[in-house]
């Protein structure tokens, strides 16, 4: 009797069919968290560039809007002379700018981890547990807190130096403040997308890596099985 050709390979090894040669691998990339991360980066960069951070009304200050761009580098002496701000307010706005820069760096690093999905254990843990996104959220919350503090200081200064006696003085938040709040919200969404995603266990990852290495080290090409299937059976021998 004879065995039909193509049933197996020498040494009793069987090959996977061509349609099922790919192993199910868990990609480390995450588009669901990369998109909110990109929105967070854009919002923080726009908030830094936008001059409107606080609206001022009713004081002697000739400016109606103040922002962190007014205190980066050279500070116009007229802002201090017109009682638009004081040295403490300048320091607070610079601290706000510093936290915005840190938020951009953290959000950018989180975005790169989500897009490229590195396999290094430390980077993998950092991405899966969304450490960079969480830091971005904390920095946005810090910026919001310092912004409120700066608005209270500016409001107190404007009330001491009203434009007219009996003028209504108020200070409100402008575009940049809400952009930072939106960046924090986007980072929260990115954090949720990473933390709620299902990942394989360590044993499952090791099994997938072992199967992948076995396939890569298989010396028999895929064409061997196809050719072997069409070989004629050997001649009958009694």
Swiss-Prot record:
> Membrane-spanning regions, if any?
96-116, 130-150, 169-189
Q: Which UniProt keywords apply?
A: Acetylation, Cell membrane, Cytoplasm, Membrane, Phosphoprotein, Transmembrane, Transmembrane helix, Tumor suppressor
Entry keyword annotation includes Cytoplasm: yes
List the subcellular locations. Cell membrane; Cytoplasm
Q: Name one GO biological process term.
A: negative regulation of cell population proliferation
* Entry GO MF terms: small GTPase binding
Cross-referenced Pfam families, in alphabetical order? TMEM127
User: Which membrane topology term applies here?
Assistant: Multi-pass membrane protein
Role description: Controls cell proliferation acting as a negative regulator of TOR signaling pathway mediated by mTORC1. May act as a tumor suppressor.
The similarity comment for this entry is: Belongs to the TMEM127 family.
Q: What is this protein called?
A: Transmembrane protein 127
């Amino acid at each position: 009797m004879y065995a039909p050709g193509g049933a197996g390979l020498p040494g009793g090894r069987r090959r996977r069919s061509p349609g099922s040669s790919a192993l199910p691998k868990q990609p480390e990339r995450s588009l669901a968290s990369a998109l909110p991360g990109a929105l967070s980066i854009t919002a923080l960069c726009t908030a830094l560039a936008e001059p409107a951070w606080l609206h001022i009304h009713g004081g002697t200050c000739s400016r109606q809007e103040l922002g962190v761009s007014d205190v980066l580098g050279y500070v116009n002496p007229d802002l201090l002379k017109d009682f638009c701000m004081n040295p403490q307010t300048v320091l607070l706005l610079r601290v706000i700018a510093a936290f915005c820069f840190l938020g951009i760096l953290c959000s950018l690093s989180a975005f790169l981890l989500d897009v490229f999905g590195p396999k290094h254990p430390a980077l993998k843990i950092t991405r899966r547990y969304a450490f960079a996104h969480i830091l971005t959220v904390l920095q946005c919350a810090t910026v919001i807190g310092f912004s409120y503090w700066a608005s209270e200081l500016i409001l107190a200064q404007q009330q001491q130096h009203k434009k007219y006696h009996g003028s209504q003085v108020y200070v409100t938040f402008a575009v940049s403040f809400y952009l930072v709040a939106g960046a924090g919200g986007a980072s929260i969404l990115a954090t949720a997308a990473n933390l709620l995603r299902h990942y394989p266990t360590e044993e499952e990852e090791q099994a997938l890596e072992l199967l992948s290495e076995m396939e890569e080290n298989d010396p028999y090409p895929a064409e061997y099985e196809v050719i072997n299937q069409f070989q004629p059976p050997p001649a009958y021998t009694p």
